[in-house]
């Protein structure tokens, strides 16, 4: 029996390695898709594209203008000067339009920065998976609401930045906690003797993850209420101010939870 168990372990190791490789490939594809559809990254790409081609056409216009001036100074045929001058003018038109487009794109505010990458969920069966799955859904909703608030100028830019920082700080705390839970679960699978020591810690960390998700959802709900009140018939008024205060309170509670959990040793120090 011991020999058979030892023979099964390499197969399990290979299977786990294959699952990890497939997960890495899926994460890479998801990250590429996320970057492609991210409004902030899309606007930055449009800016770079307009500036790059604007400079290319500007350089071509200057080059052909210089060629025309040199040919005129050397007394070349008029028809040749017309050709080179026409090329210079033809390139000046798209150069002007592209640089004007770049200036217009620069005047547009950048959308809120979304989470840097698509994170992988804990493996199926992990105690941290439900909380992290719920966090991902809440994050997508919250950053969509932040984009609406930013475009509608419902909050000052500094408050938008504070909300973004709070969301990112909490997400980092929960991701680190989920990684600790997964590591302890693997240790329990490898060593049955450690179960009695690690299971209480796993349960405590999982409870903290649930608390973090609940606090995050409170912030999302407050943000949704603020957007709803701003788009209502009443416009700016006492209701909108009340929801704005509720959003600030929910954000403060979320940041306090993340900081307290960090100070209590729930996160790895870096």
From Swiss-Prot:
Disruption phenotype: The Rv2743c-Rv2742c double mutation reduces intracellular ATP levels under surface-stress conditions to less than 60% of wild-type levels. Inactivation of Rv2743c reduces mprA and sigB expression to 20% and 10% of wild-type levels, respectively, after treatment with SDS. Inactivation increases M.tuberculosis susceptibility to the intramacrophage environment. It comes from the Bacteria. It is found in: Membrane. It is a multi-pass membrane protein. The chain crosses the membrane at residues 50-72, 77-99. The keyword Transmembrane helix applies. The keyword Transmembrane applies. Induction: Expression is regulated by ClgR. One of its GO terms (cellular component) is membrane. Keywords: Membrane, Stress response, Transmembrane, Transmembrane helix. Interacts with PspA and Rv2742c. Involved in preservation of envelope integrity and tolerance to surface stress. Reverses the inhibitory effect of PspA on ClgR activity. Facilitates intracellular growth of M.tuberculosis. This is Putative envelope-preserving system protein Rv2743c.
